[in-house]
Amino acid sequence: MRPPGFWSRPPTHPLARILAPVGRIYGGLTADRMDRPGAAPPCPVLCVGNFTLGGAGKTPTALALAGLLRDLGRTPAFLSRGYGGRLSGPVIVDPARHRAEEVGDEPLLLARAATAVVARDRPAGARLCAGSGADVIVMDDGLQNPSLSKSLSLAVIDGGAVIGNGLPFPAGPLRAPLLRQWRHVAGLVLIGEGMAGSGVAAEAEAQGLPVHRARLVPEGGADWAGRRVVAFAGIGRPQKFFETLRALGAEIVAERAFPDHHPYRPRDWAALTALAAREGGDLVTTAKDAVRLPPEARGAVAVLTVALAFDDEAGLRRQLAAALPRA
């Protein structure tokens, strides 16, 4: 879904005030659900979640955590609900066989790095992860899902967006009141800069929680300087992708923003190719969008891949090690 504009306005906005009673009910029920005890998993679970609806950078964070866990001598597997996919699982994702409409876009990216399991039933998915040889599970999303007991939960926030008007859905972007969500996290991952992000980071530090500051860095070594591009993205905050391209020196001659997890149809592809021909630019998108493109589009679009780099990687590695039993 595309976030409504009033979510980023003050909470006194008329629509926010009208929807606030519903938000209090929704947020309260979600918070009550978060407080329930979860089932014991077959191996430790590290949860990468966020406080709000929509994207915040959870998938790059999950990929980065898997790399740090390997540094610690662990064998991680990813567990995802498979948002946007029709398979309920549990199923091990095979990028050569599965499509985004079956397992979701994020699991396809995760499966390139390690075993990735899609399961609506998280305990069943955890058993499949362990059965595949994993000794630690990185759960992509699931902070508000109590079905599994977690050894460590990290909340990811986008420094440029964060919590909007601070109200629970549908009055705002929060999944539950922030005050009740804090008790379920052991640290914060702050991606990028921004006044809003700094405020939430200060709140985390005031509660004694570590704040792991990070940034998305381009991979692949492509030279974007001076390149005329038509940029499109259907992610949580497409503007961040466009800003990254501009920072790399690309000349964006046209941009198109789609809703997060947008399933690209042939008509979308036809419109994009016509736009690129008209503007004289190369089509470019994100890795997450690329797996949702029609088969005929793959190979005809440049992909900007990014990875998450932490300012204090050693500090995060220490927190991960402390949360896990000795191997």
Swiss-Prot record:
Its EC number is 2.7.1.130. It is an enzyme of class 2 (transferase). SUPFAM superfamilies: P-loop containing nucleoside triphosphate hydrolases (SSF52540). ATP binds at residues 52-59. Pfam families: LpxK. The keyword Protein transport does not apply. The keyword Nucleotide-binding applies. It catalyses: a lipid A disaccharide + ATP = a lipid IVA + ADP + H(+). GO terms for biological process: lipid A biosynthetic process; lipopolysaccharide core region biosynthetic process. Pathway: Glycolipid biosynthesis; lipid IV(A) biosynthesis; lipid IV(A) from (3R)-3-hydroxytetradecanoyl-[acyl-carrier-protein] and UDP-N-acetyl-alpha-D-glucosamine: step 6/6. Belongs to the LpxK family. HAMAP family: LpxK (MF_00409). Transfers the gamma-phosphate of ATP to the 4'-position of a tetraacyldisaccharide 1-phosphate intermediate (termed DS-1-P) to form tetraacyldisaccharide 1,4'-bis-phosphate (lipid IVA). This is Tetraacyldisaccharide 4'-kinase. It comes from Methylorubrum populi (strain ATCC BAA-705 / NCIMB 13946 / BJ001).
